[in-house]
Amino acid sequence: MINKTRTTVDQSEIDHFSRIAAEWWNPQGKFRPLHKFNPTRLAYIKEKICLAFDRDPFSLAPFAGLKILDIGCGGGLLCEPMVRLGATVIGADAAQNNIEVAKIHATQSGLSIDYRATTAEKLADKGEKFDIILNMEIVEHVADVDLFISATAKMLKPQGLMFIATLNRTWKSWGLAIVGAEYILRWLPKGTHDYKKFLKPQELKKLLLTNSLKVIDELGITYNPLNDSWNRSKDMDVNYMLLVKRLQ
């Protein structure tokens, strides 16, 4: 049972994303960067899941039979493609406004997704278990990272995979993800990120290890301004992803 006095919810973060929830599905709006790098992270997720679960990536529903949790799902930008690939998906977000937007868009798209306005710790207390857990661009927004990782670790099945995408705590990430993206290019609303919440990969790996999880792959996601594209990279100074599984 998770300590009821602790919470992963940072109310200022919830308020911030609630104010701009209607923008989730506008590719030219406030979530434009997510729309731009979504194909890159989706390709990586699909590749690794198919490899781990011995699925044919060219089949119509390679994720059939897999139960996926997208925690901090926002408007459902990852939930919808996961369902289209055949998975059973629960999308969870602490912001009710995000969940309402996600539900409406899923209905309009004819997709069945179990969206819930809840937190990782509440889901963990219910004993939920998943084949895949997506912690994408959420770690840097929670109030208690230790509790968040502990809660999500409890929900991962023995042979499951966890994907984590977040921002490194470097001067480069401060300059690009905050000064550049929020204040100069205006890609994101001011205040979207708090540099103090960024985690270095080694810090996150240590936290994962204390929860009996290990990193089996890692990569950076970098932006190319020449063709306005995001690509996989060895450069993890700003955006990076970790692929995680249980210690055997």
Curated annotation (Swiss-Prot):
GO molecular function term, any single one: 3-demethylubiquinol 3-O-methyltransferase activity
Keyword entries, A-Z: Methyltransferase, S-adenosyl-L-methionine, Transferase, Ubiquinone biosynthesis
GO biological process: methylation
UniProt cross-references to Pfam families, sorted A to Z: Methyltransf_23 (PF13489)
EC nos: 2.1.1.222, 2.1.1.64
Catalysed reactions, semicolon-separated: a 3-demethylubiquinol + S-adenosyl-L-methionine = a ubiquinol + S-adenosyl-L-homocysteine + H(+); a 3-(all-trans-polyprenyl)benzene-1,2-diol + S-adenosyl-L-methionine = a 2-methoxy-6-(all-trans-polyprenyl)phenol + S-adenosyl-L-homocysteine + H(+)
Enzyme class: transferase
Highest taxon above the source species: Bacteria
Residues the record lists as binding S-adenosyl-L-methionine: 41, 72, 93, 136
InterPro entries membership: SAM-dependent_MTases_sf (IPR029063), UbiG_MeTrfase (IPR010233)
Annotated metabolic or biological route of this protein: Cofactor biosynthesis; ubiquinone biosynthesis
PANTHER family reported in the protein's UniProt record: METHYLTRANSFERASE (PTHR43464), UBIQUINONE BIOSYNTHESIS O-METHYLTRANSFERASE, MITOCHONDRIAL (PTHR43464:SF19)
Known function: O-methyltransferase that catalyzes the 2 O-methylation steps in the ubiquinone biosynthetic pathway.
NCBIfam families: UbiG
Family: Belongs to the methyltransferase superfamily. UbiG/COQ3 family.
Record's protein name: Ubiquinone biosynthesis O-methyltransferase
Gene this chain is encoded by: ubiG
